Amino acid sequence: RFRSKTVRLFYLGTLSYSYDVETVCKGVRKLLDDGENVELHVMGGGPDLEKLKQYENRAIKFYGYLPYSEMMSIAKACDIAVNAIHSHAMQSVTNKLSDYMALQKPILNSQTNAEVLDLMNLLPHENYRSGDVDGFVQAAKNILKRKNDSVQSDEIVRRFRRDVAYQKIVNLIERLAHE
């Protein structure tokens, strides 16, 4: 879908109070100023979309809401996922993070809760503090060097294949219903 040696970062999901996409946009602009060949693809919408569109340029693209299959097709063609969640947000393992894990892409991560940090160990990742643009830039430069590191595919599939997970839930419900 894409050509060239550009490294493509992507964000999937809601653009609202809990999600720190502004730091990512500012960070990508700094990376461009530093001569890095990067793009940011933001798929999703929400109350912050119009405010964030001020950062749109040739390398930062906002798609708005897309059908799930189209969103995943674009994400597959990208290189690095961005899990940009504010430190004040209460989210744990989000649908967004589940999709990122299923795609088995390296992740730039600002979430700090233990269960998310445990999952991050299954693939190349760099953590940064939400709201810290310079920290994001440094994490991005680090992950650019490590984006081809190994991924624990079998374990990710075991934990995130929805058909497998849902069947386990169905089996549990059926077992409980028969007790």
Residue ranges and their predicted role:
Residues 13-19, 92, 128, 157, ...:
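Glycosyltransferase donor-binding loop in the core domain
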Residues 19, 67-73, 81-101, 108-118:
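Nucleotide-sugar-dependent
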Residues 6, 49-72:
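Nucleotide-activated donor-binding/catalytic signature segment of Leloir-type glycosyltransferases, i.e.
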Residues 131-135, 144-177:
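A charged, aromatic-enriched C-terminal amphipathic alpha-helix characteristic of glycosyltransferases
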Residues 12, 39-52, 64:
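Glycosyltransferase donor-sugar binding loop
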Residues 1-19, 24-28, 41:
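Conserved donor-binding/catalytic core segment of Leloir-type glycosyltransferases
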Residues 78:
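An anion/phosphate-binding loop that grips the pyrophosphate of nucleotide cofactors and donors
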